[in-house]
Amino acid sequence: MEQGGGGGGNEVVEEASPISSRPPANNLEELMRFSAAADDGGLGGGGGGGGGGSASSSSGNRWPREETLALLRIRSDMDSTFRDATLKAPLWEHVSRKLLELGYKRSSKKCKEKFENVQKYYKRTKETRGGRHDGKAYKFFSQLEALNTTPPSSSLDVTPLSVANPILMPSSSSSPFPVFSQPQPQTQTQPPQTHNVSFTPTPPPLPLPSMGPIFTGVTFSSHSSSTASGMGSDDDDDDMDVDQANIAGSSSRKRKRGNRGGGGKMMELFEGLVRQVMQKQAAMQRSFLEALEKREQERLDREEAWKRQEMARLAREHEVMSQERAASASRDAAIISLIQKITGHTIQLPPSLSSQPPPPYQPPPAVTKRVAEPPLSTAQSQSQQPIMAIPQQQILPPPPPSHPHAHQPEQKQQQQPQQEMVMSSEQSSLPSSSRWPKAEILALINLRSGMEPRYQDNVPKGLLWEEISTSMKRMGYNRNAKRCKEKWENINKYYKKVKESNKKRPQDAKTCPYFHRLDLLYRNKVLGSGGGSSTSGLPQDQKQSPVTAMKPPQEGLVNVQQTHGSASTEEEEPIEESPQGTEKKTL
């Protein structure tokens, strides 16, 4: 018997001979179901008799037939309670405890799932039962049919009979298949006794006229088939075991698929929620960044507007300051011209007294202190020393007309502080521009004429022009030595062209405003040197025309005064050519 119980797999293989005696179509279907059940975990051995015992078989995933029948009996007994109760969980706990009393350890959840699977398979079998034989569609069909068709009051009395008959079937049909008949009564004798004992109080309501034919028809359908053929009942048991295995495998697979499907749905749900949260977070981040960019742009716009306002304000202030500076310069120039006109007609001092300024000349130094005192002190110390050398040279020749010309060095000394004051007050905001203002040209002429004796000596001319540039910077004019030299050459060339034209220049000529100044300087050099080596700086026409050279100096003085008195800011015409013959020796 132990060999039959333990080697259930070999005995199932030996069952091929009765199965092969069936019709080909049914044989093929049963073989396919049997192979599927065998692949799921050796279903034939478990369905043969449960040689491992009820306790060991109940702990696995498969439900043996006896355990399933016990579950159906307990569920049938409690059918009315299940129908009336709203909460089913405590009832399934009670079903689990009853199964534990019978020796089957199953949780309430497992019991509920098993019953639902059996009920589902019953409904499916009932729908497709028309094309099959009675009793071969599903081995628990009769029990479930009785459970679903009986009224609630008689369900507790009917189900024990419908369940008790299949339990005794292996003993009645033990002759054809010793594999199922011999191990079951001996190894599991106690559980069937408990079943019979548990259903001893139920026999009184057995004689039911309405349900009698139902039970006989349903319960003994397999017996009728077994009496028709000697091997029929055992084949039905085999088929039901295979069906149970198929149901168990399919239900487990469906359960797995259902669990997997439920998990997939939950995952999809969570993924959707996560996606929504991420999208909202991204949208919030984008809006936050847009707000930051907008605020930054607004701040930049405000800063740009403020900068534009500041630039406009500074431009207005600069314009006002330049206008005020121009007005003050013109006012100072008018005052100086008035003083020059006054002093030019009243001052007649000898050259020896030129170092001691008379009382009428005290106001101009006061004006220079008010306008710009530091550049005046430096310019006077540098300009008075070289200019004093001109009278010393003029004293040497004794010609008679030297007396009228003796006033010219004094007048130049008077004019130089005044010109320096004008230059210091008219310092332009762009001293390094390409155009030279009138005051700057006059300052260059004064500095260059003051260094004429040094230019006559054999000394490097570059150092002298550097000194002139330094003196110009002290006076407020930013000109380098090269620019000063080029400007000096240009004004001498322009003076030569104007002189060669032999046109009578008016006293208020706007072009070449420094003509009279240069003319006066050149005339003084002719008279002082006597036409010697210093005549190289004089133009050719001045050498050839003694009449013009002997022109009275008073006219030149008046021209100089009128030139300084005019407040016009007209500049000289630009000269592109370089001097070719003027002052070769001096430069």
Curated annotation (Swiss-Prot):
Major location category of this protein: nucleus
SMART domains per the UniProt record, alphabetical: SANT
Gene Ontology molecular function terms on file: DNA binding; DNA-binding transcription factor activity; sequence-specific DNA binding
Biased composition regions of type Polar residues, renumbered to the chain: 538-547, 559-568
Pfam short name (any one): Myb_DNA-bind_4
UniProt feature, compositional bias: Gly residues: 1-10, 41-54
Motif interval(s): Nuclear localization signal 1: 96-103
Keywords: Coiled coil, DNA-binding, Nucleus, Phosphoprotein, Repeat, Repressor, Transcription, Transcription regulation
Tissue: Mostly expressed in siliques, and, to a lower extent, in growing root hairs, leaves, stems, and flowers. Present in abaxial epidermal cells, predominantly in guard cells, pavement cells, and meristemoids.
Keyword Coiled coil carried by entry: yes
Phenotype seen when the gene is deleted: Increased water deficit tolerance and higher integrated water use efficiency (WUE) by reducing daytime transpiration associated with a higher expression of SDD1. Increased trichome cell size with normal patterning and branching accompanied with an increase in the nuclear DNA content only in trichomes that have completed branching. No visible phenotype under normal growth conditions, but the double mutant seedlings gtl1-1 and df1-1 exhibit increased root hair length.
Keyword Coiled coil: yes
Region feature Disordered, mapped onto this chain: 1-63, 173-264, 348-435, 530-587
Acidic residues: bias regions: 233-242
Cellular compartment(s): Nucleus
UniProt xrefs under PROSITE patterns: MYB_LIKE
Induction / repression: Down-regulated by water stress.
One BP term from GO: regulation of cell size
Coiled-coil ranges (or none): 285-328
Bias (Pro residues): 201-210, 356-366
Residues annotated as domain Myb-like: 55-119, 434-492
Other remarks in the entry: Plants overexpressing GTL1 fail to develop root hairs.
Role noted for this protein: Transcription repressor that binds specific DNA sequence such as GT3 box 5'-GGTAAA-3' in the SDD1 promoter. Negative regulator of water use efficiency (WUE) via the promotion of stomatal density and distribution by the transcription repression of SDD1. Regulates the expression of several cell cycle genes and endoreduplication, especially in trichomes where it prevents ploidy-dependent plant cell growth. Regulates negatively root hair growth by directly binding RSL4 promoter and repressing RSL4 expression.
Protein name: Trihelix transcription factor GTL1
